[in-house]
A protein has these predicted regions:
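An N-terminal assembly and electron-transfer interface module characteristic of large anaerobic redox
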Residues: 1-184
């Protein structure tokens, strides 16, 4: 996991519950005739990830462990490449707004806010005003911010990215911070 804080032991209950909501409201198996898998994994280490994925892929799809291992390595390489490209693009945006004496917005949220029906297309509204929007993952150094002295409990990766991007935005004159919140 990217967030190694001692308090990082849980996953957002809303995120965990989303598969149940989708299964009961949209019922993709009945409506579209496709299986709807929603396995729950607890990956405290790379070893846990490998073991749990091997077991799930073998049971659900009959995929041999060595094939699962190769797929996992390819997925990890692709994810690392994507993260590198995302941060490079974020760095480019921040350089551009600094040159133009403008600003970008770090739009922080939980995963379910990626749904346009939940976020009401706030990112599109902001970009329509000519203001670049960056997800916290695109902000250089977001995973390097020391959060140990935070008064906020950093209980999962979303909290770490939201708080890390807020700390960076607070010290960057060309980056504003907006956090989407659905409740309390």
């Amino acid at each position: 996991t990217e967030n190694r804080q001692d308090t990082s032991v849980s996953m957002c209950a809303v995120v965990k519950g989303y598969p149940l909501v989708i299964r009961n409201s949209d019922n993709p198996e009945r409506r579209f005739g496709i299986p709807f898998d929603s396995p729950l994994f607890h990956w405290y280490s790379t070893r846990d990830m490998r073991r749990q994925l091997r077991a799930y892929l073998k049971e659900a799809f009959g995929i041999a462990p060595d094939v699962a291992d190769r797929a996992l390595e390819q997925a990890r390489a692709a994810q690392a490449q994507f993260k590198g490209e995302l941060v490079a693009a974020g760095r480019d945006v921040l350089s551009r707004v600094e040159l133009e004496n403008g600003y970008a917005i770090a739009l922080a949220s939980r995963p379910y806010h990626n749904d346009p029906l939940v976020n009401h297309d706030i990112d599109t509204l902001i970009t329509s005003l000519g203001i670049p929007v960056l997800p916290p993952d695109a902000i250089p150094g977001v995973n390097d911010v020391d959060l140990r002295n935070s008064l906020i409990d950093v209980v999962n990766n979303f909290h770490a990215r939201m708080l890390g991007s807020a700390v960076i935005a607070a010290s960057c004159p060309h980056l504003e911070y907006v956090q989407l919140v659905s409740f309390g």
